[in-house]
């Protein structure tokens, strides 16, 4: 009986030790498997924070544009300039969310497939809502660049038409070519870019999609509209048109 009790106690001890060893060995393995998930979540969080911070900085360009344009134009046109910039961002954001975002990042070579008010089609490893905000402020920037070039010589109603056009078509299509999987970034063998140049087109910070697109449209608009009324006299000589406030314009330039 004593031997049986001793054997039972020994067996219980061995079982307890074995269970403890198993737990000790399994714990690091579980921690190791959980570590990549933790690192991935941390990287996603940092990327999201940085993306939203960059979006905020790009959005801050909007008051900068407004101050520059209001400072360099005459005081009688200040309200018109400020309202254009406000409506530019308001209408542009809504239209880009409803239509432009799908055209920019939908499947397709020349233009993306439309996804009206639908964000479920995109999965790039980032929160879709945050990525939408990031792209929206870029679209608004491309549209607002044109406002200064055509200041004091564009009807308010026609400027709204232009805002709709660039937010729905021009920026989404050019953005699709370079950022949305379009033909300029197609790296497949036999594609246009690879067969002609051996590489794809890269635009890391919007120098082409945002600034060149807005700049070229501004140039075309200024060339079509011509100089401001009163800029040249009957003799063809240029006349100075003093702005409202150099202080305001300087502040806008710094922003």
Give residue ranges: language-model regions:
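Hydrophobic alpha-helical transmembrane bundles of multi-pass membrane proteins
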Residues: 3-255
